[in-house]
């Protein structure tokens, strides 16, 4: 059985993925933003291998999450599930970053760099990533007028590009990105067409399955099928520039092979 860490596992797709993997007999490490949010996990906590607490909008707390995970031990897979949708304003984290960028892009990048390297990495993206401008000149929205939809789309483009970059740089790790679709969660709303079980299925399959179809790297998935992502995501030059920018913003270097 595998050990899997899932960010943002108190509700929505993260909780559904945790429930599914626990039901399959796997060991799951849960994550909550705060102790108050952890209380919402209820009985899942007693079934889990561990619980880490930290707010991904804070670089300091993100580092703490990585430390907590490394203290538990090496993970077999990490599902980077946590994220926010459209924010009404740029906001500012304790470090001064745009909140959408910090939670959706900087946090998974930092955790990837700081957590002992697992065998599999899965990043939750969105079909909306294709609406990102693909510009790396103002990642942190310090010059542009705030556009919530564009900021979200760009953040989801970033994690697809990160998955492809890691597949190229870390050949011994299976790195993939997933579009779960428009799912009926608190974020997606009651009118979303995709049920939560369907929404969580691809990422949990990629995390633990020995099916040869799941043992691939550098792919973009939607409902167990591979799709083509935005052109920028597969461009090594874009990937390398992005990683350089993220290292500058976080002060964290991505380890080499």
Predicted regions and their residues:
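N-terminal Rossmann NAD(P)H-binding glycine-rich loop of SDR-like oxidoreductase domains
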Residues: 10, 18-19
């Amino acid at each position: 059985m595998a050990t899997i860490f899932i960010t943002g596992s108190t509700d929505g797709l993260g909780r559904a993925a945790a429930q599914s993997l626990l039901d399959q007999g796997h060991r799951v490490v849960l994550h909550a933003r705060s102790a108050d949010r952890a209380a919402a996990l209820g009985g899942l906590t007693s079934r889990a291998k561990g619980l880490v607490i930290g707010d991904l909008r804070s670089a300091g707390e993100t580092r703490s999450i990585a430390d907590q995970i490394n203290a538990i031990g090496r993970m077999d897979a990490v599902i980077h599930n946590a994220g926010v949708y459209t924010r009404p304003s740029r906001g500012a984290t304790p470090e001064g970053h745009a909140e959408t960028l910090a939670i959706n892009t900087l946090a998974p990048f930092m955790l990837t760099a700081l957590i002992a390297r697992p065998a599999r990495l899965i990043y939750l993206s969105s079909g909306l990533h294709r609406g990102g401008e693909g510009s790396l000149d103002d990642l942190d929205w310090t010059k542009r007028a705030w556009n919530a939809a564009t900021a979200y789309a760009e953040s989801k483009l970033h994690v697809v590009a990160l998955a492809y970059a890691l597949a190229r740089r870390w050949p011994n790790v299976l790195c993939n990105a997933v579009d779960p679709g428009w799912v009926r969660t608190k974020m997606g709303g009651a009118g979303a067409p995709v049920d939560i079980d369907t929404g969580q299925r691809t990422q949990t399959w990629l995390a633990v399955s020995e099916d040869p179809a799941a043992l691939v790297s550098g792919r973009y998935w939607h409902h167990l099928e591979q799709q083509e992502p935005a052109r920028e995501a597969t461009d090594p030059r874009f990937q390398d520039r992005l990683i350089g920018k993220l290292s500058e913003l976080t002060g964290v270097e991505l380890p080499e092979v």
